[in-house]
Amino acid sequence: MKIITCYKCVPDEQDIAVNNADGSLDFSKADAKISQYDLNAIEAACQLKQQAAEGQVTALSVGGKALTNAKGRKDVLSRGPDELIVVIDDQFEQALPQQTASALAAAAQKAGFDLILCGDGSSDLYAQQVGLLVGEILNIPAVNGVSKIISLTADTLTVERELEDETETLSIPLPAVVAVSTDINSPQIPSMKAILGAAKKPVQVWSAADIGFNAEAAWSEQQVAAPKQRERQRIVIEGDGEEQIAAFAENLRKVI
C-alpha cells in the first residue's frame, strides 16, 4: 500500500509584518513551517501505514525555495513518512490552488500511489480546494472533511465526516484522495530518536520538468494585503425616544 501525504510550507504567522503604507504583508522575516492542517494528514497517513500490508508513506510537496530548507525536510520526515519528494520550481513560489493541484497530481502519478491524503486547507490561503482538484485531475474519487478513518483494505477506504446535523459514513474505492479535518487526530511531537532518524531517510528533489509540468497558470496572485483598519466613531446616542431610534438607524445605515 503506497500512501502519499501532501503538505505545504507556509510562512510562520507570528513573523508576518504589515506595511503601514499600503497594507501589504511582509514575509521577508517569516520562517517557513509545515501548514498546521497538513500535520493531521501526515499523522493519519502514518497511522494507516500500521494497518496496511507492506505500507509505505511518502511525503510530497511542491513549492519554491522554502522547500530547500534542510531543517524543514527533517521536520517532515521526523513525523513518520518513509521518504520525501519535493518538487521545487520558481513558478510554484506563489502558486494558487489550481496550479498546486496540477503539480501534485503530476508528481503523484510519477511516484505511484494507492491513496493520497492532505489537509482540508492550508494555513495561509485555506482555500479548501487542492485535495478535491487533485482528485478531479487524476479522475479518481475525492472526499473532503474526513474526521475519522474507520478501516482500510487493499481496495477500499471507509471513512466518516461530520455534516451539519449528521455523521456520514463513506466507503471509497481506491485509488482515492482524502482531505482530513483537524478532528481526525492530534499530531504527535517527534521524539529525539525520530528526529535523529529523519536524517537517514531518502529525499528526492524534482523540478517541474521532471514531472512533465509546463502549464502556465490562468491567473496569478497580484497582492496580499491586510484589511484596512477603520477608526471607531464612538457615537453614543442617549435616550429611547423616536428621535434617538431614528438617529441610531441612520448611523447604522452608514456602516452596512
Curated annotation (Swiss-Prot):
GO biological process, one term: carnitine metabolic process
SUPFAM superfamilies per record: Adenine nucleotide alpha hydrolases-like
Gene3D superfamilies: HUPs (3.40.50.620)
MF annotations from Gene Ontology: electron transfer activity
The protein's assembly and partners: Heterodimer of FixA and FixB.
Protein name: Protein FixA
Its job: Required for anaerobic carnitine reduction. May bring reductant to CaiA.
Pathway: Amine and polyamine metabolism; carnitine metabolism
UniProt keyword annotations, A-Z: Electron transport, Transport
Encoding gene, per UniProt annotation: fixA
Pfam families: ETF (PF01012)
Protein origin, superkingdom: Bacteria
Recorded family membership: Belongs to the ETF beta-subunit/FixA family.
Species this protein is from: Escherichia coli (strain SMS-3-5 / SECEC)
